[in-house]
Design a protein with these regions (language model features):
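Short, internal active-site loops enriched in acidic
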Residues: 119-120, 163-167, 215-221
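Substrate-binding groove of N-acetylhexosamine-processing glycoside hydrolases
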Residues: 24-32, 51-55, 150, 182-569
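Sec-dependent signal peptide recognition
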Residues: 2-10
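Sec/Tat signal peptide C-region and signal peptidase I cleavage site
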Residues: 18-22
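Hydrophobic core
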Residues: 12-17
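Alpha-helix capping and helix-loop boundary segments enriched in small/acidic/polar residues
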Residues: 89-96, 128, 132-139, 178-187, ...
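Feature activates predominantly on carbohydrate-active enzymes
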Residues: 23-142, 146, 150-162, 272, ...
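Active-site cleft segment of glycoside hydrolase catalytic domains centered on the general acid/base Glu
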Residues: 127-135, 162-200
Length: 569
C-alpha cells in the first residue's frame, strides 16, 4: 500500500512539470516569429537596390530575425533593379533569377511567395485597364498562372494587387462597354476566384493560397468583396490603415480605423486568413525620417497581435541590412518575446550602449517617436515637400508657402482618403490649414530637438558605440531643422499677409511685425544663413520687405490641361 501511495505521489509531482514542459515546447509565441504562422520578408528595399541580394549572409540574417517566407521580388511600381512586378515580366532572364532565389530560399529553410499586379494595364499613361470581363484577358491569366505554377513548382503562394503594380480595374462609370453599370465589387470576386482556382487545379497535391491586397479599393468595396469571395484557398493582405499607407505609427489605424477592424472581422467570420503588413523604417532612406523610434515599432506589432484572425505579418518596404536600424532591433526582440512588456524590450535593445547610456538612448528614441506622431501626416499624402525632403536642412524660399497635394482616379482616393487627408486635389485651401500644418511641424521639430539633447548626453557618457549614437544624433538634428524650417515657412507666409492686412493701423502693424521679427530670428537660429540678410532688411524697412517677400500674386491664376479628358481608345 505504501509503495502504491509513493507511486501515485510521484505521478502527481511529475505530471504538472511534464505538462508545463509540453506547453513551453508548443507555445506558439516561442516560435521566434511572434507566434505567427507566417513572417514574410522582402530582400532589400526599393531605395537600397544594392541590398537586393540573395546571398547566404543576407538570408541567414533574415532567418535569425524570424522570417520564414520570402517574397521573390521587391515588386515596386517604379521597378527598381528591374524587379518583377507582373507575370508578363518573367522572361528567360527573370526566370533564371527566380530559380536561383528559390534555391537559395530552400537552402536556408524559407518558403517563397510571388507578388504580381494583375491584370496589367494595356496602356500606362493615360491609363487603359485590361478588362477582367473580357474572355481573352481571363484566358490570358489562366495560361500565365498555369505556366507559372509549372515553371516554379516550389511556390504555392501568390500575392495579387488588382490596383497599382501596373494593374488597374475598369470603372463602372465608363467607358468600358463590358464594365459600365456593373460595380467593381460584383466583377472582381469572380476574377479572383478564377485565379485561385487555376492555382489549385495546377497544384492538386498541395495547399495553395491566393493572397489578395485590396489596395486602392474603397472600404465598402473591399468588405463587399470579402463577403462574396469563395474563401477556400483565399487570404487577405492588409495595410494597418484603410486610408493611409503602411506608416509605422497608429494614427488612423488598428483600433481607430474601423475599416481595418471590419475587414479583419468579416475575414475571421468566413475563415479567411489575414496577413498584416508593417513598415519598420518609414520608407528608409526615402524621406528625412529614420528608424529610431522603437516604441512605435512595438505598438505596430501589438496592434496586429490583438486582432483575431491575423495569421502572419509581412514587411511592406523591405529589409536593407546595410542601413542601420534601431527599429530592426526592436522587431527582432519582439519576434522572440511577443508577450514581453515594452520597457523590457527597450532595455534589451539599449543595453549594448552601456549601463549609464541606455536610459538616455531610450529617452532620445521616445522623443523621436513623439516627433513622428506629432508630424502633420493628415494634411497631404506628399510628405516629402512638407518638411521631410531628405535634401533639406531647414532652408526655404521667400515666396509664399504652398502645399503639394495629390490624388489618383481610384475608388479609395475618391472616397475614404478624402477623410484621411485634408488636401487631395485642392487648388486653394483655407489659411487655417496652413497655420495648422506650420504649428504641428514646429511641434514635431521641438520634440526632435529634445531627442538631440539626449543623444548629446549619451555621447558625453562615452561608454561605447559612440559613432553609432553620433550617426543617429546627426540625422535627427537634420530632420529637426528641416521640419523647423518648413514650419517657419508656413508661419512667415501667414504673418506677412497679416501684416499687409493691418498696415494701415500702426499699433496693430507693430504687433504683427514683432511676430515676423521673432520668426526670422528663429530662422537664423535654425542655421539658415540667408535669414540673417532677410532679418536685416526687415528691420530696416518692414513695409518694403513685405512687397518682395511671401507676396501673393492675387491677380494671377495658373491653369493646366484637364488630363482626365484624354481617354485611351
Amino acid at each position: 500500500m505504501k509503495q502504491l501511495l509513493k507511486f501515485l505521489l510521484c505521478l502527481i509531482l511529475v505530471a504538472p512539470s511534464t505538462s508545463i514542459w509540453s506547453q513551453k515546447k508548443t507555445d506558439p509565441s516561442k516560435n521566434g516569429r511572434g507566434g505567427y504562422e507566417y513572417f514574410i520578408g522582402v530582400v532589400g528595399n526599393p531605395s537600397v537596390v544594392s541590398d537586393m541580394r540573395w546571398d547566404d549572409e543576407q538570408l541567414e540574417g533574415l532567418k535569425e530575425l524570424g522570417v520564414n517566407m520570402l517574397q521573390l521580388s521587391v515588386a515596386w511600381g517604379g521597378k527598381p533593379g528591374n524587379e518583377v512586378i507582373n507575370l508578363e515580366d518573367l522572361d528567360a532572364e527573370q526566370t533564371a533569377k527566380w530559380k536561383y532565389r528559390i534555391s537559395q530560399a530552400e537552402k536556408h529553410g524559407f518558403k517563397t511567395i510571388a507578388h504580381f499586379g494583375i491584370p496589367r494595364m494595356l496602356n500606362f499613361d493615360p491609363v487603359k485597364p485590361a478588362c477582367i470581363m473580357e474572355h481573352a484577358i481571363q484566358d490570358k491569366y489562366v495560361h500565365l498562372i498555369q505556366d507559372f505554377m509549372s515553371t516554379f513548382p516550389e511556390v504555392n503562394d501568390i500575392m495579387v494587387y488588382t490596383y497599382d503594380q501596373q494593374a488597374w480595374i475598369c470603372s463602372e462609370f465608363g467607358p468600358c462597354p463590358k464594365c459600365t453599370g456593373i460595380p467593381i465589387s460584383d466583377r472582381l470576386p469572380g476574377f479572383l476566384d478564377l485565379l485561385k482556382t487555376t492555382m489549385q487545379e495546377s497544384r492538386k497535391d498541395a495547399k495553395t493560397t491566393l493572397w489578395w491586397k485590396p489596395w486602392e479599393l474603397s472600404k465598402g468595396q473591399t468588405i463587399d468583396i470579402i463577403k462574396k469571395i469563395d474563401p477556400n484557398g483565399f487570404g487577405l493582405m492588409l495595410n494597418p490603415s484603410t486610408s493611409n499607407e503602411v506608416y509605422p505609427f497608429n494614427d488612423g489605424s488598428f483600433k481607430s480605423d474601423l475599416g481595418v477592424k471590419r475587414m479583419v472581422q468579416y475575414a475571421y467570420e468566413r475563415d479567411i486568413p489575414v496577413i498584416g503588413e508593417f513598415d519598420h523604417t518609414l520608407y528608409k532612406p526615402l524621406y528625412a525620417i529614420d528608424d529610431y523610434f522603437p516604441r512605435l515599432m512595438y505598438e505596430q506589432m501589438i496592434g496586429w497581435k490583438e486582432m483575431k484572425g491575423i495569421v502572419g505579418v509581412k514587411e511592406y518596404y523591405g529589409f536593407a541590412p546595410s542601413v542601420y536600424s534601431v527599429n530592426y532591433a526592436m522587431l527582432k526582440a519582439w519576434m522572440k518575446s511577443p508577450n514581453a512588456p515594452l520597457e523590457e524590450l527597450l532595455n534589451q535593445i539599449a543595453a549594448p550602449y552601456g549601463k549609464k547610456t541606455a536610459p538616455l538612448m531610450i529617452q532620445a528614441w521616445e522623443y523621436v517617436a513623439q516627433s513622428v506622431e506629432a508630424y502633420p501626416w493628415d494634411v497631404t499624402y506628399l510628405i516629402g515637400p512638407t518638411g521631410l525632403d531628405r535634401n533639406s536642412s531647414g532652408e526655404h524660399s521667400w515666396d509664399y508657402v504652398k502645399i503639394m497635394n495629390g490624388t489618383w482616379d481610384t475608388p479609395i482616393w475618391e472616397s475614404s482618403r478624402r477623410a484621411n487627408f485634408m488636401l487631395t486635389d485642392s487648388k486653394v485651401a483655407h489659411p487655417w490649414i496652413f497655420e495648422d500644418a506650420g504649428l504641428r511641424l514646429n511641434d514635431a521639430a521641438e520634440l526632435s530637438f529634445k531627442a538631440v539633447e539626449y543623444f548629446d548626453k549619451a555621447i558625453a557618457m562615452n561608454e561605447g558605440l559612440v559613432d553609432d549614437i553620433k550617426m543617429q544624433r546627426d540625422f535627427i538634428l537634420k530632420t529637426s531643422r528641416s521640419m523647423k524650417g518648413k514650419g517657419l515657412h508656413f508661419a512667415l507666409t501667414i504673418a506677412a499677409q497679416d501684416a499687409r492686412t493691418v498696415q494701415g493701423d500702426p499699433a496693430q502693424f507693430e504687433i504683427v511685425c514683432a511676430r515676423i521679427k521673432s520668426l526670422l530670428e528663429e530662422d537664423v537660429e535654425n542655421g539658415f544663413a540667408e535669414a540673417e540678410v532677410k532679418l536685416t532688411e526687415f528691420n530696416r524697412d518692414p513695409k518694403a520687405w513685405l512687397k518682395s517677400n511671401f507676396k501673393p500674386l492675387t491677380w494671377k491664376s495658373e491653369a493646366e490641361p484637364d488630363w482626365s479628358k484624354w481617354i485611351t481608345p
